[in-house]
Amino acid sequence: MDRINILDCTLRDGGYVNDFNFGHVVLKDIVQKLSSASIDIIECGFLKSGAFDVNRSLFGSVEAVKKMIGNKNPNLLYVGMVQYGGISNEEIAICDGTSIDGIRLTFHEHEIAPAFVLGRQLIDKGYKVFMQPVGTMTYTDEALLKLITRINELKPFAFYLVDTLGTMYKNDLLRMFYLVDHNLNRNISVGFHSHNNLQLSFANAQELMQLNTPRRLIVDASIYGMGRGAGNLNTELVTQYINSNLGLKYDNLEILEIIDEYIRPLSMKYNWGYDAAYYIASVAGCHPNYASFLLNKQTLHVQDIHAILNNLEFEKRALFDKKYIGEEYIRYMNHHVEDEEAQNQIVNLINGKKVLLLAPGKSLRANTERINQLISEHDDYFVISVNFIPTDIVVDASFISNMKRFKSIQDIVEQ
């Protein structure tokens, strides 16, 4: 393999966007086009216990991956990812060269010991093993050096720097790389997996590839940057950079065909890429799924997301806890407004009148004249519009069900 290698993780990391449901024909064609583009390492998806759906890049066995790969290019590597605890060693067959060649094993800091046991078992089965500690930036130098000592004893194919939270600046990357490069066995590749929360994935990848080191480097990327949250380094950008600066190697037309036929249509249906909320999550040192959770509520302004994320307990920030963020969201919403005072105000405003509720819609527009007549004939009506302010009906108050809409309407009223 060349000194610098690109690993495309579209079918695995990109799978978080569409629940891994690319479709069987699309899965096979993407792998074949990546092969034709000469992408060095193709990640086919997750190995996960019990998974069985030919349309998804989730596989319960290496045999299932084999059926999706089809004819292999002998000059490339095909890999799958195992999240420690997601599948047992017994469910993974011996590597016979007909399916995946390698397994990327991802694990948290508290899972190091059992993950290394599984790593050894996979190496003994003939797989090229990529050891990938989640959130490398959260490791102290001492903890990272201890981990490297164990890596040198294990002798996997590759060891990864993983920017899980998308917080790495150039200086962070270089400091960690030099620490690893100086202490890691020379025969072990160093990989870099980034997330684009701060729009630095491409810049950091260029810095890494420009380093004067004989060590083999692996840079992860996904087509069109497809990946959960802010997404990843774009495969088409980094391959073009290598072609232009380090020597022609990749056929980018094949990658552009994948974008045109499959990925761009998905981008019309699903959202990924840079967003202020993911920037806030990165700066606050929070898992991007926290930002995704709050964005999906569609009730919060960026200022509210900033407040919630920055009030999370520090020990809870790095690992996503859906129950915890749900509780924090409810707590914030409950305390952001003094409900009792608001209730008293609305009771005083209504003051015993009949309440007429107006909701936006076709029937309201069709009956505007009748509604105005009704209001003019009954001075004992208190008129409340729900989630909008009508331009042709005078209302006494408006009820807004979420903060984001409230602030946008508030801006209109103030103007």
Over which residues does each language-model region extend?
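A short acidic, amphipathic alpha-helical/loop segment
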Residues: 90-95, 117-118, 204, 367-374, ...
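Short N-terminal binding/cap micro-motifs at the start of the first secondary-structure element
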Residues: 15-19, 364-368, 392
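Structural motif
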Residues: 81-84, 108, 358-362, 400-403, ...
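Aromatic- and Gly/Pro-rich donor/ligand-binding loops
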Residues: 48, 335-370, 389, 403
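Glycine-rich loop at the start of a catalytic domain that most often binds anionic cofactors/ligands
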Residues: 53-64, 371-375, 395-401
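Acidic/Gly/His-enriched mid-domain segments of enzyme catalytic cores or analogous surface patches
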Residues: 374-382, 388-415
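A short, charged/proline- and glycine-enriched loop
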Residues: 1-4, 349-355, 379
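Catalytic cores and adjacent flexible loops of soluble metabolic enzymes
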Residues: 1-341
